[in-house]
Regions:
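A short, charged, amphipathic alpha-helix used as a generic interaction element across diverse proteins
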Residues: 116, 120-124
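A short, structure-level motif marking secondary-structure boundaries and short turns
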Residues: 27-29, 79-80, 123
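STAS-typified acidic loop motif
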Residues: 2-41, 60
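Short acidic-hydrophobic, aromatic-tinged amphipathic segments that line or gate anion-handling sites
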Residues: 106-116
Length: 125
């Protein structure tokens, strides 16, 4: 399922794709204070479906503001203990900020979606 969030000059497109009990939320565009609340609502809806693994793919994200980082922390905190969050982030727009603020210490980061899917147990992905 694809969701498009447009708030003023900011635009974000998120797709939700399920692989058994694993969900991939792929984001393309700007994650800022205008679009992050919409992305947060999508994440909350997805968490209500009780996935065992949540992969947030930021590969095509062109801007990733601090509110996006806060959303990742909130998502990590909302997950049940037996669920896993994997963030796909690579490069100066996404991965570097996560490393600079120390979030890479407790978030599972992968450089590609394929790498993230390799972390999913076969029965779940």
């Amino acid at each position: 399922m694809t969701y498009q969030f447009v708030s003023g000059p900011s635009s974000l497109v998120c797709t939700e794709t399920w692989h058994a009990t694993t969900v991939v939320i792929s984001c393309s565009g700007v994650v800022d204070m205008l679009t992050a609340p919409h992305m947060g609502q999508l994440v909350t809806t997805v968490l209500g479906k009780r996935p065992s693994v949540v992969i947030i793919d930021l590969t095509d994200t062109s801007m990733f503001a601090s509110c996006g980082m806060s959303l990742l922390v909130e998502t990590h905190e909302k997950l049940p203990e037996d669920a896993k969050l994997i963030v796909v982030a690579d490069g100066p727009v996404t991965r570097r900020p996560l490393e600079l603020v120390g979030l890479s210490a407790f978030l599972t980061l992968r450089s590609t979606l394929d790498e993230a899917l390799e972390d999913v147990p076969l029965a779940e992905g």
